[in-house]
Curated annotation (Swiss-Prot):
Keywords: Membrane, Mitochondrion, Mitochondrion inner membrane, Repeat, Transmembrane, Transmembrane helix, Transport. PROSITE patterns: SOLCAR. Mitochondrial inner membrane carrier protein that mediates the import of NAD(+) into mitochondria. Can transport NAD(+) by unidirectional transport or by exchange with intramitochondrially generated dAMP and dGMP. Also able to transport NAD(+) by exchange with AMP, GMP or deamido-NAD (+) in vitro. This is Mitochondrial nicotinamide adenine dinucleotide transporter 1. GO terms for biological process: mitochondrial NAD transmembrane transport; mitochondrial pyruvate transmembrane transport; NAD transmembrane transport. GO terms for molecular function: NAD transmembrane transporter activity. Belongs to the mitochondrial carrier (TC 2.A.29) family. The gene is YIA6.
């Protein structure tokens, strides 16, 4: 076949796999891997016409687009990490006011400033904060929340998905055990790495604009600086032990959530893409969170109180077992569930926002990553 720079007029790419040769005015019909001229008995392989096709820019564009490989911009690990970061950010911003209220209620039991309960109930706590500090008081600790949730959930979901595959190999017949082990592993990694951020968040949420706290922090980075220089590196890891004990929470929460996702048929397959049922995911995340919170809430009380300022005279707040004893002696069993109702109001929507948005972002990114450009 003779190569030419100017194809015969009206001989371009034709529909139904028809092509035109520069030497023949009649179209060439492409049958699988061969080209057959209608008026010739000779047959040419597709390789014989590659160069003529390349001379036609329009043809090159069409074929290049058709044969282009699937574009996969993100790996599975990257998709999981980004989805977790986005989900944590949305959750933190949405429930920050309730988080402030919960922290105040948890802390007031042993603090001298709160010998007579200063905050009462959910709405009472929120209204008291607004009255004393203005609406901005509801968003104290927002910066460390934003800084904290990004790495926390990014680390958590990444480690969880990896560990889930690992432990399923060890416990192939016991999904609950494998998922619990994966949740504990992920929780330990994220909690240990981000604990300093949550210490700062707790300090900022507890201080008042009135400046009555023993140390007044001007902001997130000022709190980090004062914590490190005035109290030492150990202060950044205050409350880590009860936080690690709180891993029993995720060991209960995530296996139940995984099971409910299947039972509620939260995922379906449509048009070669995965689709999610948001209402069913919300139900699965809410029910699983409620069960886990009821079982493991006392550790949050202990963690919050251990993270308080340590320069209160004769403070016992940095030692776990003396703190448990003092809490029980002064407040009884109900002291371990101080702010529990507020916590449920906060954590159930927070869990729903985090898990549902994680599933949504992951599903969208996975579908986009498998699209043909």
């Amino acid at each position: 076949m003779t190569q030419t720079d100017n194809p015969v007029p009206n001989c371009g790419l034709l529909p139904e796999q028809q092509y035109c040769s520069a030497d023949h005015e009649e179209p060439l019909l492409l049958h699988e891997e061969q080209l057959i001229f209608p008026d010739h008995s000779s047959q040419l392989s597709s390789a014989d016409i590659i160069e003529p096709i390349k001379m036609n820019s329009s043809t090159e564009s069409i074929i290049g687009t058709t044969l282009r490989k699937k574009w996969v911009p993100l790996s599975s690990t990257q998709i999981t990490a980004l989805s977790g970061a986005f989900a944590g950010f949305l959750s933190g911003v949405a429930v920050c006011p309730l988080d402030v209220a919960k922290t105040r209620l948890q802390a007031q039991g042993l603090q001298t400033r709160f010998e007579n309960p200063y905050y009462r109930g959910i709405m009472g706590t929120l209204s008291t904060i607004v009255r004393d500090e203005g609406p901005r008081g509801l968003y104290k600790g927002l910066v460390p929340i934003v800084l904290g949730y990004f790495p926390t959930w990014m680390i958590y979901f990444s480690v969880y998905e990896f560990s889930k595959k690992f432990f399923h190999g060890i416990f192939p017949q016991f999904d609950f055990v494998a998922q619990s082990c994966a949740a504990i592993t992920a929780g330990a990694a994220s909690t240990t790495l981000t604990n300093p951020i949550w210490v700062v968040k707790t300090r900022l949420m507890l201080q008042s604009n009135l400046g009555e706290h023993p140390t007044h922090y001007k902001g997130t980075f000022d709190a980090f600086r004062k914590l490190f220089y005035q109290e030492g590196f150990k202060a950044l890891y205050a409350g880590l032990v009860p936080s690690l004990l709180g891993l029993f929470h995720v060991a209960i929460h995530f296996p139940i959530y995984e099971d409910l996702k299947v039972r509620f048929h939260c995922y379906s397959r449509e048009n070669n893409t995965n689709s999610i049922n948001l209402q069913r995911l919300i139900m699965a995340s809410s029910v699983s969170k409620m069960i886990a919170s009821a079982v493991t809430y006392p550790h949050e009380i202990l963690r919050t109180r251990m993270q308080l300022k340590s320069d209160i005279p004769d403070s016992i707040q940095r030692r776990l077992f003396p703190l448990i004893k003092a809490t029980y002696a002064q407040e009884g069993l109900k002291g371990f569930y101080s702010g529990f109702t507020t916590n449920l109001v906060r954590t159930i929507p927070a869990s729903a926002i985090t898990l549902v948005s994680f599933e949504y972002f992951r599903n969208r990114l996975e579908n986009i990553s498998t699209m043909v450009i």
